[in-house]
């Protein structure tokens, strides 16, 4: 951004209180190292429930090739973060939802039982199996909307399977319940 400022372009920053990134093998290794150091430091916040029939759509149908290339056997969503799979840590950072739609690769379901892990952990869990990867997360989410029977007149929360967020739940619910707000991006 410094180069943009040198060109006299307007640069605005939005500060995020806390964010954890587990998207690459190096990210995961660094996080686990610091986590052990700080005695299992993970995001601890009350999971807020929004009574507006919210659906969570969570794409996790990638190959995880960066991890595979580093010798990891488990798919990225099943890798351990403080005793829980990454996918569970990621979802537990979010508001509670009435409907949870997870889009996974069929091979991860067959070989690693990712569907069982999700179904044991979350109520109203719909695991959609894909035979192959898509062109990206947006395409995967579209499949989740279509095959999951998502009510697009109710709130939909789309998140990733490999990060955690810490947010002000009161402000979030205020935005979510504001009739003038159509989309919240964070």
Range-by-range predicted roles:
Residues 9, 97-98, 153, 179-183:
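Short, high-confidence coil segments that cap the C-terminus of an alpha-helix
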Residues 11-13, 19, 78, 127, ...:
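Conserved beta-strand scaffold positions in the cores of enzyme catalytic domains, especially
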Residues 41-58, 66-68, 80, 84-158, ...:
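Conserved N-terminal catalytic core of the sugar/cofactor nucleotidyltransferase
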Residues 160-164:
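The conserved acidic donor/metal-binding loop of glycosyltransferases
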Residues 166-186:
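Conserved donor-nucleotide/metal-binding helix-loop-beta segment in metal-dependent transferases, i.e.
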């Amino acid at each position: 951004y410094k180069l943009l400022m040198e060109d006299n372009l307007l640069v605005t920053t939005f500060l995020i209180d806390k964010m954890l990134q587990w998207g690459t093998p190096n990210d995961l290794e660094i996080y686990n190292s610091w986590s052990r150091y700080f005695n299992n430091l993970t995001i601890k916040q009350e999971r807020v429930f929004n009574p507006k029939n919210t659906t969570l759509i969570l794409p996790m149908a990638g190959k995880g090739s960066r991890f595979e290339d580093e010798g990891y056997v488990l798919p990225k969503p099943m890798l351990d973060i403080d005793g829980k799979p990454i996918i569970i840590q990621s979802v537990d950072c979010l508001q509670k939802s009435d409907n949870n739609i997870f889009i996974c690769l069929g091979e991860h379901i067959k070989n690693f039982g990712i569907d069982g892990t999700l179904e044991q952990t979350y109520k109203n869990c719909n695991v959609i199996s894909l035979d192959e990867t898509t062109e990206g997360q947006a395409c995967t989410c579209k499949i989740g909307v279509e095959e999951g029977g998502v009510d697009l007149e109710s709130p939909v929360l789309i998140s990733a399977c490999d990060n955690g967020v810490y947010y002000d739940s009161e402000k979030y619910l205020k935005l979510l319940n504001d009739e003038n707000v159509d989309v919240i991006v964070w």
